[in-house]
Amino acid sequence: MKEYSYNIINDVYNWMISRKKDIEVRILKEKSQAIQVGDIITFNNQDIVGKYVKVKIANKTIVDNVYELTEKFEIERMMPGHSKEELIELMKNIYGEELNQKQIVAFEFEYLCCDSEVEFIEYNEKYLEDIKDLLVEL
């Protein structure tokens, strides 16, 4: 098991710590080629110093292009709340011509920890119905 690090923007950081995003996509280069299942990646928030998310690689898939990527994986797992077109446009803006010249790697990951633990509260359907009824009464 080896450890690697990448920089991410604050939106991606928030998606990761909230467990909405569990696939990170990169252009296949020497570093991303070397990362294997079981390796650890620390994603550092480039917008806020000291904020990070640590994950373990559960699966690694290499595809030939962004269209194959969007066929294999749900957009919501890569870019929550956005469309296929928005993901493709973002990748074109980030990688430019490289996007058409190199393969793409998708890292499916398991969340390990972050700089500050976030507590998640899960509600069952009954509770949600009770809340809806309460809101209607207000």
Listing of model-derived features with the role each one plays in the protein:
Residues S5, K56, A106-E108:
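Beta-strand secondary-structure signal
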Residues Y67-L138:
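Contiguous surface segments at macromolecular interaction interfaces
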Residues M1-E3, I40, Y52, I104:
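Intrinsic-disorder/low-complexity, polar/charged segments enriched in Ser/Thr/Lys/Arg/Asp/Glu/Gln
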Residues M1-V37, N124-L138:
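Compositionally biased, charged N-terminal/linker segments
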Residues E30, N45-G50:
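Short, charged beta-turn/beta-strand-edge "cap" motif at the junction between a beta-strand
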Residues D47, N59, Y111-C113:
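A mature extracytoplasmic/lumenal domain signature
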Residues D39, G50-I62:
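Short beta-strand-centered aromatic/proline hotspots
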Residues G38-Q46:
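Short conserved beta-strand and strand-loop elements enriched in small hydrophobics
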